[in-house]
Amino acid sequence: MAAATFWFVLRGWRTGVPPGCGLRRLSQTQGTPDYPRFLESVDEYRFVERLLPPTSIPKPPKHEHYPTPCGWQPPRDPPPNLPYFVRRSRMHNIPVYRDITHGNRQMTVIRKVEGDIWALQKDVEDFLSPLLGKTPITQVNEVTGTLRIKGYFDQQLKAWLLEKGF
């Protein structure tokens, strides 16, 4: 008890406030602080908008002839009448990718498949069989909408999907 009293007295001595005086009462007696005034300007917000990332990917511009110099081609306006659909990526490219796992397992992945993915697998096997001389090994994932093909066939499959109208 004596130690607690000693600390209260010492605290009052350090802060210059007697031990019984409430700090809340002292802070309320002072007036509200005068904050500096500010001016709200909306004219300069256009400079801030240039720094913010866009909220959505813009639509690709229209060109006179396709394919463009970089090789990009838009999908056909009426989508192909097939039981499956391969949706473009967010940058408007065909979602066919190369994948390598375990150091040397080379795979080609077709993503964003909607509809009957098994029909796409059969069409891909029919397309790649003459190129390979045998039926390619494929893996279908219905939940994620992906089709994996053993080997690198990304360029051939991109051209084939463009020809189909995706």
Curated annotation (Swiss-Prot):
The keyword Ribonucleoprotein applies. GO terms for molecular function: structural constituent of ribosome. One of its GO terms (biological process) is translation. Keywords: Mitochondrion, Ribonucleoprotein, Ribosomal protein. It is found in: Mitochondrion. GO terms for cellular component: mitochondrial inner membrane; mitochondrial large ribosomal subunit; mitochondrial ribosome. InterPro entries: Ribosomal_mL49. Pfam families: Img2 (PF05046). Component of the mitochondrial ribosome large subunit (39S) which comprises a 16S rRNA and about 50 distinct proteins. Interacts with OXA1L. Belongs to the mitochondrion-specific ribosomal protein mL49 family. This is Large ribosomal subunit protein mL49. It comes from Bos taurus (Bovine). The lineage of its organism: Eukaryota, Metazoa, Chordata, Craniata, Vertebrata. The gene is MRPL49.
